[in-house]
A protein has these predicted regions:
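A solvent-exposed, acidic/Ser-Thr-rich amphipathic alpha-helical stretch
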Residues: 25-81
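Short, low-complexity N-terminal intrinsically disordered segments enriched in polar/charged residues
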Residues: 1-34, 134-140
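Short, acidic, Ser/Thr-enriched surface-loop or helix-capping motifs
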Residues: 92, 108
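Short, surface-exposed coil-to-beta transition loops
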Residues: 68-69, 98-103
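Low-complexity, intrinsically disordered terminal/linker segments enriched in charged
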Residues: 115-140
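Conserved hydrophobic/aromatic beta-strand scaffold that supports enzyme active sites
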Residues: 82-84, 103-105
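Generic short beta-strand segments
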Residues: 84-90
């Protein structure tokens, strides 16, 4: 099989839907390569590929209660999928609703995720849960 035999957009959507939204960690064993190059800031990178993705799923689901990720834009170019998604739910400590954007770039090889860059808007998350001071009024 070669890369043209796989629907990389569908593989990405399965990671989002089954993994992040439903909490099904087995998706990582199915779709991740044993060696995953992870470039997301603060991500654990010293584990086998599936364990890296499982850690990210657990972290996201513990950081945002009732997590729903909605893919709003998605583009495929060759072996790479680029997506902008909205993550919604609530802060588990305060119960405050949260809504942030996440940018993902995933490279696949023969149906396996081999490289990932992730940019969740952590600044927006911290602001929404009150961990950062409120924005000052205009003109000050």
């Amino acid at each position: 099989m070669n890369n043209s035999d796989f629907d990389n957009v569908q593989l990405f959507r399965r990671i989002i839907d089954q993994g992040f939204c439903q909490g099904d960690l087995s998706i990582a064993d199915e779709i991740c390569a044993a060696k995953l190059s992870e470039h997301e800031y603060l991500a654990k990178t010293d584990a086998p590929g599936p364990e890296i993705l499982k850690d990210q799923i657990r972290d996201a689901r513990s950081s945002i209660r009732d997590l729903v990720l909605t893919v709003e834009d998605i583009v495929e170019s060759g072996d790479t999928v680029w997506a902008r998604s909205r993550a919604t739910g609530s802060d588990p400590r305060s119960g405050k609703p949260v809504s942030i954007y996440v940018i993902d770039i995933c490279r696949f090889d023969n149906g396996k995720l081999v490289e990932h860059w992730g940019v969740p808007d952590r600044f927006a998350l911290l602001h929404q849960i009150g961990a950062l001071p409120p924005k000052p009024p205009l003109g000050h």
